[in-house]
Amino acid sequence: MKASPHRPTKALIRLGAIRKNIQQMGAHIPEGTLKWAVVKANAYGHGAVAVATAIQDDVDGFCVSNIDEAIELRQAGLSKKILILGVSELEAIGLAKEYDITLTVAGLEWIQALLDKEADLTGLTVHLKIDSGMGRIGFREAGEAEQAQDLLKQHGARVEGIFTHFATADEESDDYFNAQLERFKAILASMKEVPELVHASNSATTLWHAETIFNAVRMGDSMYGLNPSGEVLNLPYDLTPALTLESALVHVKTVSAGACMGYGATYQADSEQVIATVPIGYADGWTRDMQNFTVLVDGQACPIVGRVSMDQITIRLPKVYPLGTKVTLIGTNGDKEITATQQRHSGMQRLFLTQFVWEIPCMVSIQVERF
């Protein structure tokens, strides 16, 4: 799949907004703290290479989820450090050394599997992942982390960092967060030698628990202008959303009362209505269950009526508008703005409660051209 430039559906990325958010984060955290930009998942849908290139002078390194994302940045000419946050396949060792990419080590069995294959770890740089309560990957006991560090160093690898990830930093209650923090601190305190880089702060932790920062932070959703909590917690400073998602009206018609829209005929007009078609759908990341979400036309909120199709939606207009009229799904239209957070909440009445604010930009597919 590649971008489709010959249709009106576009993602407009304000790289200046991302840089501004980074600068504000820098003013919020202790001086000297390293800033790592999380550009996994195509930079949360904003375009990994374009974003990383624009901000390379503002950050100390990049975080990605896998070796292919890391290599993409290297092949684009990015020279800053790159950390893979997930577990890599054993075969990625050679590529990691070739492209100077830092791997995450999360278990003794992974190290042993490498040693069983007689892999050469000389020149490999790694960070140890601690599972302090997220429950995904990582060492849960200090002894295991220490053993891993010893094994890696014995076989030529450089253990540069150690990190964890908080599960509830964006929630009102601090109880579980504090329990995780104490667990992580206890593991660090029990180690004979703590690696140089210690990081536990994702965006939420950095925003609302700045006093817990070690010596590096990982900037994800906040870098793109997204509130990690949705609207649960107030931000300590304003964030500027970087993504605008736009399309245009390609078909407009007036229908009579009783007319149905979309698969399953889930919407039926209760009066004469103006219905328009917009060329965006679930193949673009605007998912099927976003029926009833709102878009902006001429500064007015217009609901999506009928189920979202693969590459089209139907919306209800207040009046007839010309073909080509701009439709804003995320961003500003006239004197109105609709954000990813507001889109998330517009589906609340339909029990769309599991949608996190950063999922929406992440889902914008590669076929939507980015500018």
Predicted regions and their residues:
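Active-site-proximal beta-alpha core segment in soluble small-molecule metabolic enzymes
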Residues: 2-5, 9-13, 17-20, 33-199
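Conserved PLP-enzyme active-site core in the AAT-like
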Residues: 28
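Active-site anion/phosphate-binding pocket segments in diverse small-molecule metabolic enzymes
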Residues: 2-15, 19, 69, 88-90, ...
